[in-house]
A protein has these predicted regions:
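N-terminal "mature-domain start" segment
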Residues: 16-68, 114-136
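A short, solvent-exposed beta-edge/loop patch
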Residues: 62-136
Length: 136
């Protein structure tokens, strides 16, 4: 093998196995002008508390927002859009919780004492942001 072949082979292999970069921040620092992220955690997939199959997850994030109320947000990056559709169809509604599927993300928002209009603005902005994200 020539030096050039070794260099190309080494370069190609160096790109393998690296952690995928974040293509978009599903839970940004500021949302809808009134919600501020106070905590953010990149969670291990094994700690996903919801009925999302771990084999269908690429990433799991959690964040706490304060504004006109409190929102606990969980964002699941899925391996396929089909998984998102299935989750959206089978998810069980619960009090003070909203969920939605956008692109390859499934988002669960649980709120406390939140202003409904501000909560709707939060949901609309995050959903629009994820639906305009480049496909992976």
């Amino acid at each position: 093998m020539t030096r050039r072949s070794w260099f190309l082979l080494t370069s190609a292999l160096a790109g393998c196995g690296s952690k995928p970069e974040r293509s978009i921040d599903p839970l940004p620092e500021n949302v809808a002008g009134v919600w501020r992220r106070k905590e953010w955690h990149d969670m291990p997939l094994s700690e996903a508390p919801d009925p999302v199959p771990q084999s269908s997850l690429r990433r799991f994030e959690s964040a706490l927002y304060q504004g006109p109320g409190v929102i606990q947000a969980r964002a699941y990056q899925l391996t396929s859009k089909a998984v998102g559709l299935e989750l959206a169809q089978r998810w069980r509604p619960s009090a003070d919780t909203v969920f939605f599927w956008a692109g390859d993300w499934f988002i669960v928002l649980k709120w406390q004492d939140a202003d409904r209009t501000a909560l709707q603005a939060f949901t609309r902005e995050v959903e629009a942001r994820l639906n305009t994200a480049p496909a992976r």
